[in-house]
Amino acid sequence: VNDWGMAQLVGRYPEQFELCMGTLLNKRKKDPRLSYLKSRLPDKDTGLLAENSLNADFYQKALEKNLGFVRYEWESCGYPKRFPEEKTSLHLPFYQTNTSQYCTLYAQYREHNRGRQYLQTECPGYCQMQAFLYPEHLHMTGRYNSLFSLDQTILRALETGSVENAAFGEAEQEVQPDRAVLNLL
């Protein structure tokens, strides 16, 4: 489930559904440009990127009790994560960095400046055939109203080991995801 309204609706029928909190609801900082910032931050601050609210037991219990979530989905995003002890899926090698209600392709075509975005009520469908490319070292692309990136650390791990090592060798930790989800955009 990637929508709070849908979670509320299907959470009314716990005997019929086993809910999984999707990657869009599992909020965390995911941006390939963070690696440049990380080199300038003290280690104590970069370690904070490894966790989010799902690492708090009370939050997991509240999600399970109130909405019926029993599994959580994470995205590989180029830096270590600390996974909670609940059932966890890891999506790899692509991840979504952000989504906007505005269309950068529309702004580029109409305004010749992708920064001049505003809400559109009728979509001409530019994104059906076009995408934004970012500098190669970022491994990012802009498609539809979202930015996506490729986790290079996962690809390097695949070259030297198995899919399991790449997916679950995220960090020296006791808890690892129990399922890998391959996404190819």
Regions found by a protein language model. Name each.
Residues 1-185:
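Active-site pocket-lining/capping segments in soluble small-molecule metabolic enzymes
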